[in-house]
């Protein structure tokens, strides 16, 4: 900080330098992110509510009402009447909140070290949970499809089992665990089941909409206790906009603490100060697009994913790990180390990410990516393959 302030022109000159260092979603070259270019309609709403703080909802009654309407809409999307929850910073916070609730419920009747049953495919946010909440991990094996091997679950449940986690749209491969079967096991053993649908939550319902071949992952599964769903992924809301939905009000109330100096006497979130702009943007987009609008957005992305998969699948040097269920394609190339391939693609201006298990290249087909971007990517990939032969 300077002793004296600088001119606005001088400050913004530097801002432009920083801004030009950033990748832009509109370039179509960000192929490894689950976030995307925000919908301009949502951005307009975001700016309109930029001053709001849902940490003090009595001051911002309209914004607080919008949050409840958003939670009701998301609950309806996930087949739950009378949902409880919040719009939060993202999937990590939502997952932590769910695990906090699970631990508090566990501690009502247990004194042993709590155990969390989760797959190797779980998002890294659960590693934060293990440390923050002093929880012991119990990893359930994956089957040949890289999904939870549900046959192994009953043997892993003990008196110390705090919760189980299932994934609807794994971060690395975009796969959906057998939530209906996991739900039956959770309900049978009385275990809290959290579904991380940060990615799939804004995809699967619109794939299912007016479609008889439905993926079942939500509160229709009676053993599901809570679901993470992120509007700032396929919902096109600006970052940060995550969501956590609980089946029962008593679950959310487990997070309640007194806030005597604010306009409301309690909070049920981890974060205190909480922007209302994300809620306003999400409310706007849910109303603006509706089910039909989001169905079109999702179909466009899935069609592009299928197109990309088919093109890659025809390349004899490329091995695709799993036929995509959502909008993620993971692959490797013969005779090229995965880390080397990532760096070589980056040299051509393509930002792809790596999956850890299995260790492969990971493409995420989000709404900012167009067919012409994929065609350009495939040309560059082929050039790299030929150079490495």
From Swiss-Prot:
Q: Which protein family is named in the record?
A: Belongs to the group II decarboxylase family. MfnA subfamily.
Please report the organism this UniProt entry assigns to the protein. Answer: Methanosphaera stadtmanae (strain ATCC 43021 / DSM 3091 / JCM 11832 / MCB-3)
- Molecular function (Gene Ontology), one example: aspartate 1-decarboxylase activity
Name the enzyme's class.
Answer: lyase
This protein's gene is called mfnA
Q: Which residues carry this modification: N6-(pyridoxal phosphate)lysine?
A: 233
User: What pathway annotation does it carry?
Assistant: Cofactor biosynthesis; methanofuran biosynthesis; Cofactor biosynthesis; coenzyme A biosynthesis
List UniProt keywords, sorted A-Z: Decarboxylase, Lyase, Pyridoxal phosphate
User: HAMAP family annotated for this entry?
Assistant: MfnA_decarbox (MF_01610)
This protein's cofactor list reads:
pyridoxal 5'-phosphate
Protein name in the entry: Probable L-tyrosine/L-aspartate decarboxylase
* Gene Ontology biological-process annotations: carboxylic acid metabolic process; coenzyme A biosynthetic process; methanofuran biosynthetic process
EC number(s) for this protein?
4.1.1.11, 4.1.1.25
- Highest taxon above the source species: Archaea
The answer, when asked if Ion transport is one of the entry's keywords, is no
Keyword Cytoplasm on this protein?
Answer: no
Reactions catalysed, as given in the entry: L-tyrosine + H(+) = tyramine + CO2; L-aspartate + H(+) = beta-alanine + CO2
> Could you tell me which Pfam families the record lists for this protein?
Pyridoxal_deC
- What function does this protein fulfil? Catalyzes the decarboxylation of L-tyrosine to produce tyramine for methanofuran biosynthesis. Can also catalyze the decarboxylation of L-aspartate to produce beta-alanine for coenzyme A (CoA) biosynthesis.
């Amino acid at each position: 900080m300077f002793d004296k302030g600088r001119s606005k022109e001088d400050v913004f000159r530097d801002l432009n330098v920083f801004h030009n260092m950033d990748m832009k979603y509109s370039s179509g070259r960000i192929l490894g992110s689950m976030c995307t270019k925000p919908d301009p309609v949502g951005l307009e709403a975001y700016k309109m509510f930029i001053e709001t703080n849902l940490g003090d909802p009595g001051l911002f009654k309209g914004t607080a009402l919008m949050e409840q309407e958003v939670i009701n809409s998301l609950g309806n999307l996930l087949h739950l009447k009378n949902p409880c929850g919040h719009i939060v910073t993202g999937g990590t916070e939502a997952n932590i909140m769910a695990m906090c609730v699970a631990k508090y419920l566990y501690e009502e009747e247990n004194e042993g070290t709590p155990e969390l049953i989760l797959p190797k495919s779980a998002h890294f946010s659960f590693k934060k949970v293990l440390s923050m909440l002093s929880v012991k991990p119990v990893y359930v094996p994956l089957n040949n499809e890289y999904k939870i091997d549900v046959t192994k679950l009953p043997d892993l449940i003990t008196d110390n089992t705090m919760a189980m986690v299932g994934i609807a749209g794994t971060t690395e491969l975009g796969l959906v665990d057998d939530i209906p079967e996991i739900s039956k096991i959770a309900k049978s053993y009385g275990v809290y089941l959290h579904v991380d649908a940060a990615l799939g939550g804004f995809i699967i319902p619109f794939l299912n909409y007016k479609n008889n071949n439905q993926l079942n992952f939500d509160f229709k599964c009676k053993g599901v206790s809570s679901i993470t769903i992120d509007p700032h992924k396929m919902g096109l809301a600006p970052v940060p906009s995550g969501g956590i939905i609980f089946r029962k009000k008593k679950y959310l109330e487990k997070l309640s603490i007194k806030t005597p100096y604010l306009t409301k006497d309690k909070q049920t979130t981890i974060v205190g100060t909480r922007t209302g702009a994300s809620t306003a943007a999400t409310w706007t987009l849910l109303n603006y697009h509706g089910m039909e609008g989001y169905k079109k957005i999702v179909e466009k992305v899935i069609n592009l994913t299928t197109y990309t998969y088919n093109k890659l699948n025809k390349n004899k040097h490329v091995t695709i790990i799993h036929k995509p269920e959502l909008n993620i394609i993971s692959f490797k190339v013969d005779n090229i180390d995965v880390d080397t391939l990532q760096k070589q693609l980056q040299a051509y201006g393509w930002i792809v990410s790596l999956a850890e298990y299995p260790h492969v290249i990971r493409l995420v087909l989000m709404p900012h990516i167009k067919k012409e971007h994929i065609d350009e990517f495939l040309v560059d990939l082929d050039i790299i393959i030929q150079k490495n032969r």
